[in-house]
Regions:
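Active-site-proximal segment of zinc-dependent metalloprotease catalytic domains
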Residues: 112-183
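Propeptide-to-catalytic entry region of secreted or membrane-anchored zinc metalloproteases
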Residues: 1-133, 140
Length: 183
């Protein structure tokens, strides 16, 4: 980057690769109907993915310019809802899973910081598509007992590269999957 600062200027012709990442959103609901607090609608999920794409492209109208100079740039990464399941069936990329049978899930969600709840891997093992082919996003009802509607809470998390594939992906509170939010 230091050798070619001109690459960071908007409108600069540069050699780039553009990446499209197939995404599957696993909605780990507790039996509630689509559109309830822990089971967002398809439109809500698609709106949040569209927002994510706008942020990565540098086109989201709500973005503030960099404080210390520079410019907002297109990261050349796009997230696209998966169109095929691992078995090659058609999909919209949204996988709704009733997770209410998981131990402690309905009352406390997933356990991240040694709180009461379902172990993270137990939840992920219920709904994980091959991490070599898809980016998995799990929408959960609660993390460490908090659902994101009041008080302090963990909105979501992911692991750094190098973590085992069993952990790969993003876990996010269903209440925080909202277009325009900075989660």
């Amino acid at each position: 980057i230091q050798a070619h600062p001109e690459w960071l200027r908007p409108g600069t012709n540069r050699l780039t690769a553009s990446y499209t990442i197939p995404v599957v959103v696993h909605v780990m609901h507790t039996g509630g109907a689509v559109g309830t607090i822990y089971n967002p609608t398809d439109a809500q999920i698609l709106g949040a993915i569209n927002y994510l794409n706008q942020v990565f492209a540098g086109t989201y109208a709500g973005m503030t310019p960099p404080v210390e100079g520079g410019a907002v740039v297109n990261m050349e990464v796009q997230f696209a809802m998966a169109q095929r399941t691992p078995a090659c069936g058609a999909t919209n990329g949204i996988d709704r899973v009733d997770a209410s049978a998981l131990p402690n899930y309905t009352a406390n969600g997933i356990n991240v910081n040694n709180a009461t709840g379902c172990p993270e891997l137990t939840m992920k093992n219920l709904a994980r598509w091959n991490t070599s082919n898809y980016y998995n996003i799990w929408l959960v009802n609660k993390i460490d007992g908090a659902d994101g509607t009041s008080g302090q809470f963990i909105a979501g998390f992911a692991y750094f590269p190098g973590a085992p594939s069993t952990l790969d992906g993003t876990v996010m509170l269903a209440t925080q999957m909202v277009a325009g939010e900075k989660t």
